[in-house]
Amino acid sequence: MALERTFSIIKPDATRRNLTGAINAKFEEAGLRIVAQKRIHMTKAQAGKFYAVHAERPFYDELCEFMSSAPVVVQVLEGEGAIAKNREIMGATNPADAAPGTIRAEFAESVGENSVHGSDAPETAAEEIAYFFSGLELVG
């Protein structure tokens, strides 16, 4: 597998409960390196633009409210097959369906407050990374 980068967000439900370190440990234990990371408080407008692909979905407004309700940690993860590996570590969107040992199985509170976001493809990873980071901030 090729070395690749993916984008991750540790969401407000997890940052409120001080789970950033525990979640980062899961990434690192799986062989992913954190090559960029910052804690930010997204505005509702930033969240809306980031999740614009979901604008027509019934949960869009609630998602934007949630993502701007408290700080998040945005990060770039690097490793062999990083996109697929991150999605495996995160677990299913619904924590009730997430495999034991995954981030969502251990930490998520609900489908809406599921602790993490991860890119689903190389194209979206590149777009999502560029939304939050300049090339100078990627220090892997």
Curated annotation (Swiss-Prot):
Stated name of the protein: Nucleoside diphosphate kinase
Protein's gene: ndk
Annotated positions binding ATP: 11, 59, 87, 93, 104, 114
Cofactor(s) of this protein: Mg(2+)
Known role: Major role in the synthesis of nucleoside triphosphates other than ATP. The ATP gamma phosphate is transferred to the NDP beta phosphate via a ping-pong mechanism, using a phosphorylated active-site intermediate.
GO BP terms, alphabetized: CTP biosynthetic process; GTP biosynthetic process; UTP biosynthetic process
Keyword line: ATP-binding, Cytoplasm, Kinase, Magnesium, Metal-binding, Nucleotide metabolism, Nucleotide-binding, Phosphoprotein, Transferase
Reaction(s) catalysed by this chain's protein: a 2'-deoxyribonucleoside 5'-diphosphate + ATP = a 2'-deoxyribonucleoside 5'-triphosphate + ADP; a ribonucleoside 5'-diphosphate + ATP = a ribonucleoside 5'-triphosphate + ADP
Annotated PANTHER family: NUCLEOSIDE DIPHOSPHATE KINASE
Family listed: Belongs to the NDK family.
Statement: the UniProt record of this protein carries the keyword Acyltransferase: no
Subunit structure: Homotetramer.
GO molecular function, one term: metal ion binding
Active site residues according to the UniProt entry: 117
Subcellular location: Cytoplasm
Main localization category: cytoplasm
EC number per UniProt: 2.7.4.6
Gene Ontology CC, one term: cytoplasm
Keyword RNA-binding found: no
